[in-house]
C-alpha cells in the first residue's frame, strides 16, 4: 500500500510534532511504502520568503491602507503608524526575510552583525521592544531572539490586515473551540492564507504525484483542524474516491470522538 502521512499547519516551529515520524516508521515496518510530509514547516517557508512576502504585501496593500486610515480616524495613532511602517519598509522585509530564516536555523552567521546594526534591516514593534529591554548594546548572542521577533512582527501584520485567523503556531483555533456549525467552519476554508499560500504548498508537493492509496492527516491541536480539512479537500477534489483519507491525532481523540457531522464525509473516509 502507498501511504502519505501529513502534518498540516500550524504547529510549533521549534518543537515539531512527532506523530508523522512515528506513523511513517510504523507503516514502513509493516512493509508499506510510506512517506511523511511536514506541511506546517512548508507553509512557513512558502509565506516567509522573498516570493511569499512580495505576494503578501501585494495582496494586502489596499486593505492595510484602509485599516491604517481607520485607525488614525479612531485615534489609534500607534496602530496606524505600525501598519504604514510595514508598507513603507516592505522592500527591507522582502530583502531580509530569507536571511532571517537562515539566522533562525543557525546558518546565517555572516549576516548576524548586519541584521543587528544595519539601518536598512527591518524593524517591528516586537523587535524594538526586545532591543529596548536589553538596556545594553545588542550582541550576536541576541540575534536569534531578534529574528524570532521579526517573524512575530510579520505575523502581527498578517493577522491585522490580511488574515485574522493566522498565528505562527495555530490557525483558526477558535473555529473548533467555539460552538459553531460545521457549515460555518467550511466557509473559513477560503480564508486568505489557505487560499493564496497553503494551496500553493499542496500543489508544489502533490500536483505531479500519483494518487496514494491512503492519506493520513494528523491533527494534534485545534489550530490544525481547518488546514487539515483544507488538505483533505485538496486530495478529494484531485483524486475523488480513489484516495482513502483518514484523520487522527490528539485533537481528534479528545474533541471529535463522538462526532456525528455527516458533512465531514465529504472530506474524509475514516477517523482514527
Each predicted region: which residue ranges?
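Nucleotide-activated donor-dependent transferases that construct or modify glycoconjugates
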Residues: 2-12
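Glycine-rich beta-alpha loop elements in corrinoid/cobalamin-binding modules
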Residues: 10-13, 18-19, 23-52, 93, ...
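Conserved phosphoryl-transfer catalytic core
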Residues: 46-106, 120
Amino acid at each position: 500500500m502507498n501511504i502519505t502521512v501529513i502534518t498540516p499547519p500550524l504547529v510549533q516551529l521549534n518543537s515539531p510534532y512527532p506523530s508523522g515520524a512515528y506513523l511513517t516508521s510504523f507503516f514502513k515496518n509493516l512493509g508499506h511504502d510510506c512517506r511523511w510530509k511536514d506541511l506546517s514547516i512548508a507553509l512557513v517557508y512558502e509565506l516567509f520568503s522573498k516570493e511569499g512576502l512580495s505576494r503578501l504585501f501585494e495582496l494586502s496593500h489596499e486593505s492595510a491602507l484602509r485599516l491604517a486610515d481607520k485607525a488614525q480616524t479612531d485615534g489609534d495613532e500607534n496602530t496606524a503608524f505600525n501598519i504604514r511602517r510595514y508598507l513603507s519598509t516592505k522592500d527591507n522585509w522582502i530583502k531580509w526575510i530569507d536571511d532571517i530564516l537562515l539566522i533562525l536555523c543557525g546558518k546565517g552567521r555572516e549576516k548576524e552583525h548586519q541584521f543587528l546594526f544595519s539601518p536598512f534591516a527591518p524593524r517591528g514593534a516586537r523587535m524594538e521592544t526586545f532591543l529596548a529591554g536589553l538596556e545594553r548594546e545588542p550582541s550576536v548572542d541576541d540575534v536569534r531572539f531578534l529574528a524570532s521577533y521579526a517573524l512575530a512582527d510579520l505575523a502581527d501584520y498578517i493577522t491585522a490586515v490580511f488574515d485574522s485567523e493566522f498565528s505562527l503556531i495555530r490557525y483558526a483555533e477558535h473555529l473548533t473551540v467555539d460552538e459553531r456549525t460545521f457549515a460555518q467552519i467550511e466557509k473559513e476554508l477560503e480564508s486568505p492564507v489557505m487560499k493564496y499560500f497553503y494551496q500553493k504548498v499542496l500543489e508544489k508537493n502533490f500536483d505531479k504525484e500519483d494518487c496514494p492509496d491512503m492519506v493520513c492527516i494528523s491533527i494534534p491541536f485545534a489550530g490544525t483542524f481547518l488546514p487539515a480539512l483544507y488538505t483533505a479537500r485538496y486530495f478529494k477534489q484531485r483524486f475523488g474516491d480513489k484516495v482513502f483519507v483518514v484523520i487522527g491525532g490528539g485533537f481528534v481523540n479528545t474533541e471529535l470522538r463522538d462526532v456525528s457531522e455527516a458533512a465531514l464525509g465529504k472530506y474524509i473516509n475514516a477517523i482514527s
